[in-house]
Amino acid sequence: MYRPEIKRKKSGAPVLSRKEIDVIGQNIVGDFMPEALKSPQEIDIDLLAQDYLGMDQDFQYLSHCGVYLGMTVFNDTDKVPVYDPQNNCADYISAKAHTVIIDKMLLEENQEHRYRFTMGHEAGHEFLHKEYFAYDPDQITLFDLMGETPAPMVQCRVDTKKMDCRTSKSWTDRDWMEWQANALSSAVLMPVSMVRMVAENFKRPGLHQIFCHYALAEEVASVFNVSFEAAGYRLKQLGYIPQEAQLSTDILNMISFDLACNY
């Protein structure tokens, strides 16, 4: 399996730029699914997590209100917090290390894109952050001397996709790792070289520029089976759509209807 050299803080948290994460994502895809770097296509994120990274997959309700979408378990534990809808109460279950738990809400209709991004996010935690969270029970550490143990898991909230590096001065290691997991999910689901191939081969002659932005984001979303929002963000990040451009799914629906009538 591909193993990049990653600079880390003393805590074990990685220090990575967006460009470095793009390289890591591209190399993961190249090692796992080489054909996906020859022609743009959907990445099988379930197969990557389970077969390539060796993660076990589980589905639970992680909260009563959908605030948590996914969870990565790094150490064996019998204290995984879940929600029991039948009894309307919190509960605990057991899970082994290297388990990814996805909220059952994401198995519902029209949730495929959120599911795929969340699986990519949790796979990102597994690939990048084991050194920070993992605990060797055969070694005595400072945690043992203090009567504590490291957190056995990381819970991922629904709002982390909105994290912006421009506010990063006050970020903790955990904040940075959420951002890194988001960035790696994007880099794996939409490998940089393949997004560039789609964008540079995309042509809609006679179409107004703002409509071109919408059409390009819709094309990327379709090719890689990701959300329109994720595709637009990726294209902005790579410079194909201006950062200040506002992309609305409501306007997309109107434009898509108009394009269907004219092409």
Annotated model-derived regions:
Residues 1-263:
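Active-site hotspot residues in diverse enzymes, especially metal/ion-binding acidic/histidine motifs
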